[in-house]
Amino acid sequence: MSTEVNLDKLYENSIKILSDLIGFKTISGEDNNDLINYCEKYLNDLGATSFKTYDDEKKRVNLFATIKAKKSNGVKPIILSGHTDTVPVSKSWSTDPFKATIKEDKLYGRGSCDMKGFIACTLAFAPVFSKVDLNRDIHFSFTFDEETACLGAPILIKELKKRNIQDGIC
Protein backbone atom coordinates (compact mmCIF):
# COMPACT_ATOMS: atom_id res chain seq x y z
CA MET A 1 0.00 0.00 0.00
CA SER A 2 1.25 3.46 -0.87
CA THR A 3 2.20 5.70 2.02
CA GLU A 4 1.95 8.85 -0.08
CA VAL A 5 0.06 11.59 1.75
CA ASN A 6 -1.84 14.44 0.13
CA LEU A 7 -0.71 17.33 2.33
CA ASP A 8 -3.32 19.74 0.97
CA LYS A 9 -6.11 17.32 1.88
CA LEU A 10 -4.51 16.67 5.28
CA TYR A 11 -4.38 20.43 5.92
CA GLU A 12 -8.02 20.89 4.88
CA ASN A 13 -9.12 17.99 7.11
CA SER A 14 -7.15 19.44 10.03
CA ILE A 15 -8.90 22.80 9.64
CA LYS A 16 -12.33 21.14 9.33
CA ILE A 17 -11.77 18.98 12.43
CA LEU A 18 -10.29 21.89 14.39
CA SER A 19 -13.32 24.02 13.52
CA ASP A 20 -15.57 21.24 14.83
CA LEU A 21 -13.53 20.87 18.04
CA ILE A 22 -13.56 24.62 18.73
CA GLY A 23 -17.36 24.45 18.58
CA PHE A 24 -17.43 22.26 21.69
CA LYS A 25 -17.45 24.40 24.85
CA THR A 26 -15.03 22.39 26.98
CA ILE A 27 -14.02 24.87 29.66
CA SER A 28 -12.12 23.28 32.57
CA GLY A 29 -14.45 21.70 35.09
CA GLU A 30 -17.34 21.49 32.64
CA ASP A 31 -18.80 18.65 30.56
CA ASN A 32 -16.64 17.46 27.65
CA ASN A 33 -18.68 14.39 26.63
CA ASP A 34 -19.76 15.75 23.24
CA LEU A 35 -16.19 16.44 22.14
CA ILE A 36 -15.00 13.02 23.34
CA ASN A 37 -17.93 11.28 21.61
CA TYR A 38 -17.02 13.11 18.38
CA CYS A 39 -13.39 11.96 18.62
CA GLU A 40 -14.35 8.40 19.55
CA LYS A 41 -16.77 8.05 16.64
CA TYR A 42 -14.23 9.49 14.23
CA LEU A 43 -11.55 7.03 15.36
CA ASN A 44 -13.87 4.02 15.67
CA ASP A 45 -15.11 4.63 12.11
CA LEU A 46 -11.47 4.10 11.05
CA GLY A 47 -11.26 0.78 12.91
CA ALA A 48 -9.79 1.98 16.20
CA THR A 49 -10.75 0.34 19.47
CA SER A 50 -11.44 2.61 22.41
CA PHE A 51 -12.54 3.00 25.99
CA LYS A 52 -13.49 5.91 28.22
CA THR A 53 -12.86 6.77 31.85
CA TYR A 54 -14.97 9.24 33.81
CA ASP A 55 -14.88 11.54 36.79
CA ASP A 56 -17.17 10.64 39.70
CA GLU A 57 -20.09 12.63 38.24
CA LYS A 58 -19.63 11.20 34.70
CA LYS A 59 -19.67 14.72 33.26
CA ARG A 60 -15.99 14.78 32.32
CA VAL A 61 -14.45 11.97 30.35
CA ASN A 62 -11.12 10.74 29.02
CA LEU A 63 -10.74 8.80 25.77
CA PHE A 64 -8.11 6.19 24.97
CA ALA A 65 -8.27 4.82 21.43
CA THR A 66 -5.90 2.56 19.52
CA ILE A 67 -5.18 1.89 15.88
CA LYS A 68 -3.50 -1.50 16.06
CA ALA A 69 -0.29 -2.39 14.26
CA LYS A 70 -0.80 -4.64 11.28
CA LYS A 71 2.66 -6.18 11.75
CA SER A 72 3.49 -5.79 15.42
CA ASN A 73 7.14 -6.46 16.12
CA GLY A 74 7.16 -5.71 19.84
CA VAL A 75 8.21 -2.08 19.56
CA LYS A 76 6.68 0.43 21.95
CA PRO A 77 3.54 2.17 20.75
CA ILE A 78 3.31 5.84 19.93
CA ILE A 79 0.96 7.79 22.21
CA LEU A 80 -0.57 10.98 20.83
CA SER A 81 -1.75 12.72 23.97
CA GLY A 82 -3.68 15.93 24.49
CA HIS A 83 -6.18 17.58 26.78
CA THR A 84 -9.65 18.67 25.75
CA ASP A 85 -10.34 21.48 28.21
CA THR A 86 -9.75 25.17 27.71
CA VAL A 87 -9.38 28.10 30.06
CA PRO A 88 -12.46 30.31 30.54
CA VAL A 89 -13.21 32.93 27.90
CA SER A 90 -12.02 36.46 28.61
CA LYS A 91 -14.09 39.51 27.67
CA SER A 92 -11.48 40.69 25.16
CA TRP A 93 -12.62 38.37 22.35
CA SER A 94 -13.79 40.30 19.28
CA THR A 95 -15.30 37.17 17.66
CA ASP A 96 -17.26 34.19 18.94
CA PRO A 97 -14.55 32.13 20.74
CA PHE A 98 -16.45 28.90 19.98
CA LYS A 99 -16.56 29.46 16.23
CA ALA A 100 -13.38 29.06 14.22
CA THR A 101 -12.56 32.33 12.49
CA ILE A 102 -9.83 32.74 9.88
CA LYS A 103 -8.30 36.21 9.53
CA GLU A 104 -5.16 36.91 7.51
CA ASP A 105 -4.28 33.19 7.26
CA LYS A 106 -4.60 32.69 11.03
CA LEU A 107 -7.29 30.59 12.68
CA TYR A 108 -8.80 31.92 15.90
CA GLY A 109 -11.00 30.06 18.35
CA ARG A 110 -10.91 28.89 21.97
CA GLY A 111 -8.44 26.02 22.25
CA SER A 112 -7.03 26.40 18.73
CA CYS A 113 -3.44 26.43 20.02
CA ASP A 114 -3.89 24.79 23.43
CA MET A 115 -4.65 22.09 22.56
CA LYS A 116 -7.45 21.38 20.16
CA GLY A 117 -5.16 22.16 17.21
CA PHE A 118 -2.91 19.23 18.10
CA ILE A 119 -5.89 16.92 18.63
CA ALA A 120 -7.27 17.97 15.22
CA CYS A 121 -3.95 17.15 13.56
CA THR A 122 -3.82 13.70 15.18
CA LEU A 123 -7.37 12.97 14.05
CA ALA A 124 -6.70 14.26 10.53
CA PHE A 125 -3.72 11.92 10.27
CA ALA A 126 -5.62 8.92 11.72
CA PRO A 127 -6.91 7.77 8.29
CA VAL A 128 -3.29 7.47 7.14
CA PHE A 129 -2.42 5.37 10.20
CA SER A 130 -5.43 3.15 9.57
CA LYS A 131 -4.37 2.39 5.97
CA VAL A 132 -0.64 1.74 6.27
CA ASP A 133 1.11 -1.35 7.59
CA LEU A 134 2.01 -0.03 11.03
CA ASN A 135 4.73 -1.86 12.95
CA ARG A 136 3.53 -0.42 16.25
CA ASP A 137 0.21 0.60 17.79
CA ILE A 138 -0.85 4.24 17.67
CA HIS A 139 -2.70 5.36 20.81
CA PHE A 140 -4.82 8.50 21.06
CA SER A 141 -5.10 9.72 24.65
CA PHE A 142 -7.42 12.67 25.25
CA THR A 143 -7.94 13.83 28.83
CA PHE A 144 -9.95 16.41 30.76
CA ASP A 145 -9.09 19.21 33.19
CA GLU A 146 -5.41 19.73 32.39
CA GLU A 147 -5.84 23.51 32.63
CA THR A 148 -6.74 23.33 36.33
CA ALA A 149 -5.31 20.42 38.31
CA CYS A 150 -4.68 17.65 35.76
CA LEU A 151 -7.63 15.72 37.18
CA GLY A 152 -8.29 13.53 34.15
CA ALA A 153 -4.86 12.02 33.53
CA PRO A 154 -4.55 10.13 36.85
CA ILE A 155 -7.93 8.47 36.26
CA LEU A 156 -6.82 7.32 32.82
CA ILE A 157 -3.40 6.17 34.05
CA LYS A 158 -5.05 4.00 36.70
CA GLU A 159 -7.17 2.31 34.02
CA LEU A 160 -4.18 1.83 31.70
CA LYS A 161 -2.36 0.03 34.50
CA LYS A 162 -5.41 -2.19 35.14
CA ARG A 163 -5.53 -3.11 31.45
CA ASN A 164 -1.76 -3.66 31.35
CA ILE A 165 -1.39 -1.30 28.39
CA GLN A 166 2.27 -0.86 27.52
CA ASP A 167 3.82 2.56 27.95
CA GLY A 168 5.10 4.13 24.80
CA ILE A 169 6.66 7.06 23.06
CA CYS A 170 4.70 10.28 23.53
Each PLM stretch: what is its role?
Residues 2-110, 129-135:
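Acidic/His- and Gly-rich active-site-bordering loop/insert found
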Residues 115-170:
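Acidic/histidine-rich catalytic neighborhood of metal-dependent amide-processing enzymes
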